[in-house]
Amino acid sequence: MALLQLERIGAQYPGAAAPVLADINLSLGPQQLLVALGPSGSGKTSLLNLIAGFIKPGSGRITLDGIPVEGPSAERGVVFQDDALLPWQNVLANVAFGLELAGVGRLERETRAREMLALVDLAGFDQRRIWQLSGGQRQRVGLARALAADPRILLMDEPFGALDAFTREQMQELLLQVWQRTAKPVFLITHDIEEAVFLATDLVLLAPNPGRIAEHLHLDFGRRYAAGESARAIKSDPRFIETREHVLASVFSQRTREQCV
């Protein structure tokens, strides 16, 4: 059963000549990791902002467990490419920040924060300052902070886009481990094709101007990693390579078609 439902969603920014999204129908349920991929102008970030409640659709409706999404909520945790951490606070305070705003007592919020730091392999980092962390460690803190509030779903806006290739792969693998352990549905947007194919249980390919769903693929590579198969074995699987090439051709076709319009 779907937890999150998007029905015939359309969106257009004030003053824009054309809509940014049109007729988007999507659902996200338990044990799903839904990835949206597409060229510039396909509305990936706008779609995430709609689900997060940062902007409102021009048409259609978005519901979480049957209740309309009217604005931001702790039920939808968000991880951004820019981690937006508080540099004057230590790691523990950053992870516990949302809980503090929600009025959670100090002992409870710090206990929860330490649990989330352990989940993202940062146990013992609670007193570190943000400036002492690498880019990958900062993203782990951002992920722990989003999870600390125990959201119903996790939204991720190109979370690994600014990382080097090695750290990006580490973070992809960590995300799959966290996804398996928490069983939280994840909606992630990316511009990286191999990342999308590796992570997704459901991969939505978006076409641009206006953003719309061109193709919806059901994949199992991320589940295979979560079940214990190595990333190297998965990425050398001929079926993975074939899927990656299919997605690359689809994205390239959409981009070429747009340039010819």
Curated annotation (Swiss-Prot):
UniProt keyword annotations, A-Z: ATP-binding, Cell inner membrane, Cell membrane, Membrane, Nucleotide-binding, Translocase, Transport
GO molecular function: ABC-type taurine transporter transporter activity; ATP binding; ATP hydrolysis activity
Membrane topology category: Peripheral membrane protein
Highest taxon, organism lineage: Bacteria
CDD domains given in the database record: ABC_NrtD_SsuB_transporters
InterPro entries attached to this UniProt entry: AAA+_ATPase, ABC_transporter-like_ATP-bd, ABC_transporter-like_CS, ABC_transporter_ATP-bind, P-loop_NTPase
Subcellular location: Cell inner membrane
Chain residues that bind ATP: G38, P39, S40, G41, S42, G43, K44, T45
Main location: membrane
Residue ranges occupied by any ABC transporter domain in the UniProt entry: 4-233
EC numbers, comma separated: 7.6.2.7
Pfam families: ABC_tran
SUPFAM superfamilies, per database record: P-loop containing nucleoside triphosphate hydrolases
GO cellular component terms listed in the entry, alphabetical order: plasma membrane
Catalytic activity: taurine(out) + ATP + H2O = taurine(in) + ADP + phosphate + H(+)
Subunit structure: The complex is composed of two ATP-binding proteins (TauB), two transmembrane proteins (TauC) and a solute-binding protein (TauA).
Function: Part of the ABC transporter complex TauABC involved in taurine import. Responsible for energy coupling to the transport system.
Family of the protein in this entry: Belongs to the ABC transporter superfamily. Taurine importer (TC 3.A.1.17.1) family.
Family annotation (PANTHER family): TAURINE IMPORT ATP-BINDING PROTEIN TAUB, TAURINE IMPORT ATP-BINDING PROTEIN-RELATED
Protein name: Taurine import ATP-binding protein TauB
Gene name per UniProt: tauB
